[in-house]
Amino acid sequence: MVIEELRWWHIPEVLTIEEDLFGVEKWSAAMFWGELARGHYYRIATEDHQIVGYGGLALLAPDEATVSNIAVRRDHQRRGIGEALLKDLLDEAERRGAHRIVLEVATDNAPAQNLYRRYGFTPAGIRRRYYQPSGTDALTMIRKGGAS
């Protein structure tokens, strides 16, 4: 597996993963274009030159970042790809001086919540009906400090 920068020409392949994993709640091409245009940090994980996962990080303030998303193709889940992407994002947050990292995760996504807990994220609250149109709640998690 190789982790590298997500570039504009990767967006169509990323959208295929988005559609499969998130259906009507998927991000659009314009959303990814916007993230890249704002200079946010986006990475892809590839195997045999195919994208198998991706993740993004945005700096909110000089010392605070948010994990925008992490997603792994269904047929490649449970292989450590999401963890590798998370480590990459956390390392970049530390390089940029972010000492507080925030993320939202669906309340019904226990595997992701467990991964985030292993990396020092703790629950901070619930955002009701965060994911639309399903109305699924999101658990907000926060990581303070720099130990990855």
Task: Please annotate each region the language model reported.
Residues M1-I3:
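Extreme N-terminal starter segment of soluble prokaryotic enzymes
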Residues E104, R117, T122-A138:
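Conserved catalytic-core motifs of GNAT/GCN5-like acyltransferases
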Residues R78-A93, A110, N114-R118:
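Conserved acetyl-CoA-binding loop-helix of GNAT-fold acetyltransferases
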Residues E5-D75, L86-D88, E92, R96, ...:
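Acetyl-CoA-dependent GNAT
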Residues A93-E104, R127:
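Conserved GNAT acetyl-CoA-binding A-motif
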Residues M141:
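Divalent-cation-assisted or electrostatically stabilized phosphate/pyrophosphate-binding catalytic cores
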Residues R7, R73, Q77, A106-D108, ...:
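Residue-level recognition of the GNAT/N-acetyltransferase active site
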Residues D63, H99, T122:
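Short acidic/polar active-site loop segments enriched in Thr and Asp
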